[in-house]
Amino acid sequence: MEFKDKQVEVLGARTRYYDVGQGEATILIHGGGPGASGLSNYRKNIEALSAKRRVIVFDLPGYGHTEGKLKDGAIYEVLGDFTRAFMDAIGVDKASFVGNSLGGGTSLMVALRAPERVNRLVLMGTGGSQAMFSPMPTEGLMRMARFNAGDGPSMAKLKAVLELLVYDQSTITEPLMKERLEAATRSDIIDIFKRPGLDIWREDLASLKHRTLIVWGREDRVVPFDSSFILLKTIPNAQLHVYPKCGHWAQWEKADEFNALVADFLDRP
């Protein structure tokens, strides 16, 4: 299924987004790896999740086809502010959020700073948490941080990163790699790792009253599975779903199961 993109100005940046389906709004926020974008992260989920709801997917600043670099400040504060401004720009007062990695941390920050604008949260391999046992930084994070170093971006470096996003490397296709390499030259990925404010787990997560579905791949090599424990322990209405033989991209590797799981979670009264 092809999706037609739209453009809107958000805080001075021309922002690409997709708006599919009707009903209660659900906003999908992508991760922060090289070449990431809303469509490249959620291509396998938009059609299924939009069957009963309005699904909105946008590119964060510095990613995909959204103009501009991130403003100065703590990373998740900046992205949370941008997300709320995006909601204002397209006339969405309140939404459920589905966020992967960087997008999960951004979703959490929106809920922390503007809880009245959030219905439910779905967090996959969420950034901003803290591993309990696994050594940090992970191999995946180190490869991301090195992507623009030395001779700069390359297909070999990108492949090395993407292979760590998944358990089954056959799911990383040539078209996906080409799409992400083209976008990667516009990515703000190095800037992200130099910024403060990555530790959302230090925030008052116990204040969140939203129903929250935490999703993790057991073999996640970017944000390890044991990073889910603090979120599960501190967010009062959180539940955890773990996929075996799955990496950092649960929404991609386990797309059919993930779509059914999330749709059921969002549909519950």
Name every feature range the model reports, one short phrase each.
Residues 1-14:
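N-terminal cap/lid segment of alpha/beta-hydrolase-fold proteins
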Residues 108-112, 119-151:
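Flexible "cap/lid" loop of the alpha/beta hydrolase fold
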Residues 190-233, 242:
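Conserved serine/cysteine hydrolase catalytic core
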Residues 99, 103, 107:
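Gly/Ala-rich beta-loop-alpha elbow adjacent to hydrolase catalytic centers
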Residues 238-269:
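Catalytic active-site module of serine/aspartate enzymes centered on a nucleophile-bearing elbow/loop
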Residues 11-65:
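Conserved HGGG/HGGXW glycine-rich cap/lid loop of the alpha/beta-hydrolase fold
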Residues 47, 57-98, 260:
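Active-site loop/oxyanion-hole signature of alpha/beta-hydrolase fold enzymes
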Residues 132-138, 151-210:
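Conserved alpha/beta-hydrolase catalytic His-Asp/Glu region
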